[in-house]
């Protein structure tokens, strides 16, 4: 195949949006207080809690300032203030790297005790294994933390798929709607951008990837919030990705 790299989004691309919105996010929100409280005394050694605290201190939004004032006036403890702030970020769906890191640690607990099992699209496991056998380099770029990405594929209902991927990228690499992020990824893959196919359910992300020189495919699945592919090629199943790759040979 001419294109040797597949860069895959997760939510709405290899995994149904509803699994993330109806299972993963509610679990993380439910367990957030427990996790922060249990690890509060370890915060000098917890990079994720320190990062979340710094983000809160730097946030000058009205909601953030209200919670800070409650702490200053001794209405609530610092730990409760941070928990309230993080729940606020969840409620407004902010793409916070610190929050994503914490969610990954909480999901690790859920996957580890068997409460969570990843639900992928029916064809995902078969396609991933097929692409891997064909010699394609498979990589992930998701707003979820790398830890969360690996957990999702390690604990899928279709078995452990983690080893099929060679590279993992999250928002530590850069925002997904910035072309510079995709340029960085191409460099880390040691590949020309035009040798990389990026598959995502978000048209703005596809636009940014194409600006960086990548090929793009827009994943249009049931339940995906973004229904506008702009002028990107549309796939309704990962099997269609395989067909397009064959057509490019």
Curated annotation (Swiss-Prot):
Enzyme kind, highest EC tier: hydrolase
GO biological process, one term: L-methionine salvage from methylthioadenosine
Organism: Synechococcus sp. (strain CC9605)
Catalyzed chemical reaction(s): 5-methylsulfanyl-2,3-dioxopentyl phosphate + H2O = 1,2-dihydroxy-5-(methylsulfanyl)pent-1-en-3-one + phosphate
Pfam assignment, any one: Hydrolase
Function: Bifunctional enzyme that catalyzes the enolization of 2,3-diketo-5-methylthiopentyl-1-phosphate (DK-MTP-1-P) into the intermediate 2-hydroxy-3-keto-5-methylthiopentenyl-1-phosphate (HK-MTPenyl-1-P), which is then dephosphorylated to form the acireductone 1,2-dihydroxy-3-keto-5-methylthiopentene (DHK-MTPene).
Annotated EC: 3.1.3.77
CDD domains linked: HAD_EP
Cofactors: Mg(2+)
The protein's name: Enolase-phosphatase E1
Free-text cofactor note: Binds 1 Mg(2+) ion per subunit.
């Amino acid at each position: 195949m001419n294109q040797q790299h597949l860069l895959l989004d997760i939510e709405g691309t290899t995994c149904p949006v509803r699994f993330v919105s109806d299972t993963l996010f509610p679990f993380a929100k439910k367990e957030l207080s427990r996790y922060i409280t249990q690890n509060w005394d370890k915060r000098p050694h917890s990079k994720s809690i320190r990062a979340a605290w710094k983000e809160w201190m730097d946030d000058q939004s009205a909601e953030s300032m209200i919670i800070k004032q409650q702490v200053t006036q001794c209405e609530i403890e610092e730990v409760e203030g941070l928990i309230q702030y993080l729940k606020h970020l969840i409620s407004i769906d902010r793409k916070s790297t610190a929050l994503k890191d914490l969610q990954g640690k909480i999901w690790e607990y859920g996957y580890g005790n068997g409460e969570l099992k990843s639900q992928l699209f029916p064809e995902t496991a078969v396609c991933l294994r097929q692409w891997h056998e064909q010699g394609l380099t498979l990589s992930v770029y998701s707003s979820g933390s790398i830890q969360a990405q690996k957990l999702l594929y390690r604990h899928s209902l279709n078995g452990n798929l983690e080893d099929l991927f060679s590279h993992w990228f999250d928002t530590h690499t850069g925002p997904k709607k910035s072309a510079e992020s995709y340029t960085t990824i191409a460099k880390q893959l040691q590949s020309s951008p035009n040798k990389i196919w990026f598959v995502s359910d978000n048209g703005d992300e596809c636009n940014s990837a194409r600006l960086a020189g990548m090929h793009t495919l827009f994943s249009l699945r049931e339940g995906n919030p973004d229904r506008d592919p702009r002028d990107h090629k549309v796939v309704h199943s990962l099997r269609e990705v395989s067909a397009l790759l064959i057509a490019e040979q």
